[in-house]
């Protein structure tokens, strides 16, 4: 039994080292966003804390007093493991929230899908979106 436990410990440590060696896999997208210029979004798993998904969202200008809404859906082969949303204050031109990644025995997410939205303005209330995705691992 002790030999098996040592082998499992070695395998877990090796997997963690290899995941760090791969580096950050960031996904960045941008698209035209009307009166806001361009909306840009990025998402990636933190290298300093693997339990965090970092996101960045920005627009060229926000004279419409709109706000950012960032939606994250963590998934694995079995389906969705969790969902979270964060919103900025009105009038911001950038918003960079981080989201907790929950690794449990029952649910280990393997991917994060992110919707980067700007909405709620007076001229363009329905807003604009761009979408990113990022692999996540232990």
Give short role names for the model-derived ranges:
Residues 1-49:
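N-terminal prepro-regions of secreted/extracellular proteins
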Residues 24-25, 58, 82, 126-133, ...:
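Intrinsically disordered, low-complexity segments of exported/surface proteins
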Residues 28-77:
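Short, surface-exposed binding/anchoring microloops in extracellular/periplasmic proteins
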Residues 37, 92, 128:
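Extracellular and organelle-lumenal recognition/adhesion modules and their flexible linkers in secreted
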Residues 44-47, 102-106:
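Extracellular and analogous surface-interaction loops
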Residues 79-95:
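Solvent-exposed serine/threonine-rich low-complexity stretches and specific carbohydrate-binding patches
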Residues 93-105:
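Exposed aromatic-hydrophobic patches
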Residues 103-108, 112-137:
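Short, exposed beta-strand-loop hairpins at the edges of beta-sheets
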């Amino acid at each position: 039994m002790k030999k098996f436990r040592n082998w499992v410990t070695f395998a877990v440590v090796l997997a963690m080292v290899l995941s760090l060696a791969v580096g950050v896999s960031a996904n960045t997208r941008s698209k035209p966003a009307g009166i806001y210029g361009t909306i840009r979004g990025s998402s990636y798993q933190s290298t300093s804390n693997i339990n965090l998904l970092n996101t960045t969202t920005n627009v060229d200008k926000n004279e419409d007093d709109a706000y950012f809404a960032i939606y994250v859906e963590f998934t694995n082969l079995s389906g969705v493991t969790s969902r979270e949303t964060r919103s900025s204050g009105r009038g911001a031109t950038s918003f960079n929230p981080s989201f907790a990644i929950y690794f449990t025995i029952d649910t280990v997410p393997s991917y994060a899908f992110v919707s980067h939205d700007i909405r709620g303005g007076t001229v363009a209330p329905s807003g604009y979106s761009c979408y990113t995705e990022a692999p996540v691992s232990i």
